[in-house]
Amino acid sequence: MAASFDYVVVDTWPSFAEAVLTTMDLADDILLVMTLEMTAIRDVRLYLDVVDKLNYPPEKVKLILNRSGSVGGIRVEAVEETLRHKVAVGLANDGPAMLMSVNQGVPLVISAREHAFSRDIYRLTKLVTSVNTDEMAPAQATATPTGATQDAAQATRLMSKLKAAFR
């Protein structure tokens, strides 16, 4: 696949099975997505210990903090100190905006480029690619995918019918 595409993203399952280890060996970067929950932090610590024992360079593993800014009492700095690894990018926590984006069928990075989550996705893109997202033409950043407007209108009509059916 790497011969055919500039970037290949593989979402693996949380294990060190042979297929996962092979994927990790072939990867330029490993994006480890985590949240600020004690169980997730513990699992990340164990993962980083194994990765260290496998002699992967520390810079190959990039911590991505999902739901950044969530209230829960655990500070990012304390987690970084505990893990001895910096969080590379935090992804803003905004459930309502994400739900609206999914229901409308238009990615938030297209419909609301200045939204905190969109800016975080652009930072993540910049981290793993050579794409300078700061210089993207406004037309590229705000273009609507073909049919997305019609899909959003259709979704709105469908939701109206569903609401009416459940009244």
Regions of interest found by a model, annotated:
Residues 34-35, 61-73, 90-96, 111-113:
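G-domain G4 guanine-recognition motif of GTPases
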Residues 38-41, 45, 73-76, 95, ...:
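Amphipathic alpha-helical transducer elements in NTP-driven molecular machines
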Residues 27-29, 56-61, 84-87:
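Short glycine-/polar-rich loops that comprise or flank the Walker A/P-loop
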Residues 67, 80-109, 121:
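Beta-strand-loop-alpha "switch" segments that mediate conformational coupling across diverse proteins
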Residues 2-6, 16-38:
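Inter-motif core of Ras-like GTPase G domains
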Residues 106-167:
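NTP-binding/hydrolysis catalytic cores, primarily Walker-type P-loop NTPases
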